[in-house]
Amino acid sequence: VLAGTIENLRVQTQNRLFSDLNQQGTLWWRPLQHLSKTVDISQKAQSLHFDAESRERYFTVCLKNSTRLRKLIQWAQADKNKQRQMRILVIDDEADQAGINTCNIDAEEVSRINKLIRALVNGKNEDGKDIESTYLAMNYVGYTATPYANILNEPPEKGSLYPRSFITTLAVSKEY
């Protein structure tokens, strides 16, 4: 989960997810914190079980800042064999905050954080270059109540987080 720019809110989101995901069921969700190439051995990809038969699942809540995103990408790509086993769902909480491309689109510039999110989602290294290994699956879901910046700042182009058909309007619930 990509969650904002404030650490105490990141921790709050992680704790809420841990509590909500670990209800009754056969899966156990384990939080991984501040992932990087130098993380504790128990959180390195080589120590984790990504096979479909494993009852253990993993999640991390990462701040949308360039250092954390760069380290997350490096962690995910540190072990090529494990990377090929990873099924990743990136959930961009408040996708209109910090992650949108705020650079001049006519100059084909990309903001640093948007470039790193694109690299993660599109299977590139932290410099945006192709890598030798790919993930088993990669999906990106960005949600926000106000998607105007996402629509207007980033036209659908190669590598964009938002293809032409990225918006889905949800039906109004009966409780509304």
Question: Where are the regions a protein language model picked out?
Answer:
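A short acidic (Asp/Glu
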Residues: 9-18, 69-74, 98-104, 150-155
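Conserved P-loop NTPase catalytic core
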Residues: 86-92, 101-176
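Conserved RecA-like helicase motor-core motifs
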Residues: 22-42
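Conserved Walker A/P-loop ATP-binding site and its immediately adjacent core
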Residues: 1-28, 145
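Conserved RecA-like ASCE ATPase "motif II neighborhood" in helicase/translocase motors
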Residues: 37-91, 99-131
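Short His-Asn-centered micro-motif
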Residues: 2-4, 61-64, 92, 143-144
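Conserved nucleotide-binding/hydrolysis micro-motifs of P-loop NTPases
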Residues: 6-9, 66-68, 96-97, 146-150, ...
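Amphipathic alpha-helical scaffolding segments
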Residues: 15-21, 77-78, 87-90, 160-163
